[in-house]
Amino acid sequence: MATTADFRNGMCLEIEGQYYFIVEFLHVKPGKGPAFVRTKLKNVTTGRILDKTWNSGVKVEEVRIERRPYQYLYQDEMGYNFMHPETFEQITIPGASIDGVQFLKDGDMVEVMVHATSETVLTCELPPHVKLRVTYTEPGLKGDTATNTLKPATVETGAEVRVPLFIQEGELIEVDTRDGSYIGRVKE
């Protein structure tokens, strides 16, 4: 059991039989009345966000999770399929519970979160940055580098990323999987 004072981002809670990750939390101490905690929780199975307010000091059920490395294999109608590199065990995770799934490509290593006691697969976490090749983008105008203008570019996974005008087709770029933003060009 944990109290609201123990809340931190990424913590997993069990509420009414459902598993939730804390996305954001804020301790509020109003001038009048008792303190409380506002949280934004993400449902592990559906991916939906829930806003919940807790009275300060309330006890909640914390879920112990283990992080295990898995390799992405392929996608089918059941979801996304991963394989453990040592045991070759294969698992399927629904796409709704994976953040940044549009940046996932064959062979990528991810961290799969597993319930420590029941061995239930909860979700997976992509690395914060991935290197992807640009497959399509409009050509930039020569000499148009004075402004910080961005243009849409399609990467090898099919996702669309906003990139600077100087990026061309075939270039390797680094993308932040948390918000889908362009980080920089990768030297080959």
UniProtKB/Swiss-Prot annotation:
Its main subcellular localisation, reduced to a broad class, is cytoplasm
Which terms under GO biological process does the entry name? peptide biosynthetic process
GO annotations of cellular component type: cytoplasm
Instruction: Report the locations given in the UniProt record.
Output: Cytoplasm
Name the InterPro entries for this protein: Elong-fact-P_C, NA-bd_OB-fold, Rib_uL2_dom2, Transl_elong_fac_P/YeiP, Transl_elong_KOW-like, Transl_elong_P/YeiP_cen, Transl_elong_P/YeiP_CS, Transl_elongation_fac_P
UniProt KW keywords: Cytoplasm, Elongation factor, Protein biosynthesis
- Lineage top rank: taxon: Bacteria
GO MF entry, a single one: translation elongation factor activity
The record's function comment reads: Involved in peptide bond synthesis. Stimulates efficient translation and peptide-bond synthesis on native or reconstituted 70S ribosomes in vitro. Probably functions indirectly by altering the affinity of the ribosome for aminoacyl-tRNA, thus increasing their reactivity as acceptors for peptidyl transferase.
PANTHER family named among the record's database cross-references: ELONGATION FACTOR P, ELONGATION FACTOR P (EF-P) FAMILY PROTEIN
Task: Please give the name of this protein.
Answer: Elongation factor P 2
> Gene name, please?
efp2
